Amino acid sequence: MALKHFNPTSPGQRGLVLIDRSELHKGRPEKKLVEGLTKSGGRGGNGRIAVRFRGGGAKRLYRLVDFKRRKQGVATVVRLEYDPNRTAFIALIKYQADGELAYILAPQRLKAGDEVVTADKVDVKPGNTSPLRTMPIGTIIHNVELKPAKGGQIARSAGAYAQLVGRDAGYAQIRLNSGELRMVLDTCLATVGAVSNPDHSNQNLGKAGRVRHMGRRPHVRGVAMNPVDHPHGGGEGRTSGGRNPVTPAGKPTKGAKTRVNKATDKFIIRSRHKAKKGR
């Protein structure tokens, strides 16, 4: 979908660039496929801040999106919808066999009236789902499973995709947007195509109020705080922080490695960090 550029008739309109969502459904979501969503304000189970600068925002209903796509058969796309809980658009589909409704991630070039298929072998058309072992090498995919039957975990945000680049000894090799090359079992499911709304990153919300509506609060710099609040805080007058950049907990930021799951290192053929250095 295209971008909408606004004329500078007010400070909040100046520079405003939004996604044109005129082709999406304008009514309420499917009632059977939504749940209430309680705001956390960025707090964890113990009531303490887990994620800084979160709170407020418009009320939302959580759409129950089917990331597993285990139901075999043909379904027809009823409509495309906006989902406030994710950057991508979602599609309401209706299975032809029994009339069951479900939400799925909408890939690019999918429109109302199209058919999507889940089967062991499918045509290479956006929205079709099959195991990686039956897909042609080079296929652009999204919503890729890391473990069979767990549901898609890779390439789910707006405009994201991965590419199937090879198969070997029961594993499929996929290249991610980050440059990482990794293996997953070839029995894992993936969906053909790239995720919808690729222009999401080109939006300019124009004013702070629109960001607040999304539940995000002002992001305060550590050097603007007091020493009790941040390792960079305090000092007479403006300071540079006086040390290498750290988090509020004092851990190095700006590129320090945080990955600790050595058990799955064997599935990563080429790290995303090495991929960046090689460019």
From Swiss-Prot:
Q: How does it assemble?
A: Part of the 50S ribosomal subunit. Forms a bridge to the 30S subunit in the 70S ribosome.
Entry function:
One of the primary rRNA binding proteins. Required for association of the 30S and 50S subunits to form the 70S ribosome, for tRNA binding and peptide bond formation. It has been suggested to have peptidyltransferase activity; this is somewhat controversial. Makes several contacts with the 16S rRNA in the 70S ribosome.
- Which BP terms does GO give this entry? cytoplasmic translation
What InterPro entries does UniProt report for this protein, alphabetically? NA-bd_OB-fold, Rib_uL2_dom2, Ribosomal_uL2, Ribosomal_uL2_bac/org-type, Ribosomal_uL2_C, Ribosomal_uL2_CS, Ribosomal_uL2_dom3, Ribosomal_uL2_RNA-bd_dom
What PROSITE patterns does this protein map onto?
RIBOSOMAL_L2 (PS00467)
Q: Name one GO cellular component term.
A: large ribosomal subunit
Instruction: Check the record and name the SMART domains matching this protein.
Output: Ribosomal_L2, Ribosomal_L2_C
Q: Which GO MF term does the entry hold, naming one?
A: structural constituent of ribosome
Name the UniProt record assigns to this protein: Large ribosomal subunit protein uL2
Q: Which UniProt keywords apply?
A: Ribonucleoprotein, Ribosomal protein, RNA-binding, rRNA-binding
Task: Reply yes or no: does the keyword rRNA-binding apply.
Answer: yes
What Pfam families does UniProt report for this protein, alphabetically? Ribosomal_L2 (PF00181), Ribosomal_L2_C (PF03947)
In the record, the note on similarity to other proteins reads: Belongs to the universal ribosomal protein uL2 family.
**What residue spans carry the region label Disordered?**
222-264
